[in-house]
Structures are given as structure tokens and as C-alpha cells.
């Protein structure tokens, strides 16, 4: 009975003062976000990440993101690009599981070319416009390429430097 009385008072007040009571539709203007993980899969990770903590961390992060406006991708590299996924929606459980399986299948081997991995990730991020972009590098160190390879450490480091400058210009 008390609730009905309060409800009637509210209705009467709304009728007496209609200009004071109104509803406004609030539109959320969240900026979409693309996150790309650049994952070092070189042989040194076998000893420096024995428990595969870096990969587990990325998988755990994937589990925590369920928003439609956040897209996640990755680039797995050593001295070549091993696998990648351009940023994509993981709002559905199936999408999250598929991405986690891809990341879980990554193996550690060979040498390290950080410039190559970051450059590839930068290309994947640059493709999408009107999106906030975030790049996360997971590595145990520096570029490590043996002498006599067609690509030198200096070339890799120059490419890395160029990518960092591009990322700064693009707000990544």
C-alpha cells in the first residue's frame, strides 16, 4: 500500500511539472581498440620462458576481453614470421577459444629478428582507421641473427627504429 502511495505521488508530481521531467538517450561513443601482441618465438625463449608464461599471459588476456569494440591479434616471429592473426573481434567464446588455440600452438626455435616482427605487426595495425591501436611486444631480449645471413642485425634494428617512429606518428 505504501508503494502505491509513493508511485501516485511521483505520477502527480510528473503531471504538475512536466517540463522538469524528461529522459535523454545517452549514446556511448567508445572508441574501438585494436591490440596486437608481437611474440618472440626464438630459440632463446626455450630457456628464458620454459613455462611459456608469455604465451599463457596472452591467452589469459584473451579470456578477459569480451567487448565487441576490442579486437585482438598477434604476430609470432623468430627470424621469420611464423604465424599471425590480424586484430579481430573475440566477443564470442568460440572466437576467443580459436585465438587461444592458435597462440597455444606456437613453438620456440631459431634466431631473433625483432624488427621483422614489429614491422609486420605495424602493417596489420595500420590497415584499420578510426581505431585506437596498441602494440605489446613480448620478448626476452634483442635481435640475434647469425653472421652470414641475408639480413643483418643492423637492418633489423633500422627497421625496428622506423616502425617505432611510425607508431609514434600514428599514436600507437
Predicted regions, residues:
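Positively charged n-region of N-terminal signal peptides that target proteins for export
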Residues: 1-5
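Bacterial N-terminal signal peptides
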Residues: 8-16
Amino acid at each position: 500500500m505504501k508503494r502505491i502511495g509513493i508511485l501516485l505521488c511521483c505520477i502527480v508530481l510528473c503531471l504538475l511539472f512536466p517540463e522538469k521531467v524528461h529522459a535523454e538517450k545517452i549514446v556511448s561513443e567508445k572508441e574501438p581498440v585494436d591490440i596486437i601482441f608481437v611474440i618472440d618465438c626464438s630459440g632463446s625463449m626455450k630457456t628464458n620462458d620454459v613455462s611459456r608464461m608469455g604465451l599463457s599471459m596472452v591467452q589469459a588476456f584473451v579470456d578477459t576481453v569480451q567487448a565487441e569494440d576490442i579486437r585482438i591479434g598477434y604476430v609470432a616471429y623468430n627470424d621469420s614470421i611464423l604465424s599471425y592473426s590480424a586484430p579481430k573481434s573475440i566477443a564470442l567464446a568460440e572466437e576467443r577459444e580459436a585465438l587461444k588455440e592458435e597462440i597455444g600452438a606456437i613453438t620456440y626455435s631459431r634466431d631473433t629478428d625483432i624488427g621483422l616482427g614489429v614491422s609486420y605487426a605495424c602493417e596489420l595495425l595500420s590497415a584499420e582507421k578510426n581505431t585506437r591501436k596498441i602494440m605489446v611486444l613480448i620478448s626476452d631480449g634483442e635481435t640475434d641473427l647469425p653472421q652470414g645471413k641475408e639480413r643483418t642485425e643492423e637492418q633489423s634494428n633500422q627497421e625496428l627504429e622506423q616502425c617505432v617512429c611510425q607508431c609514434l606518428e600514428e599514436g600507437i
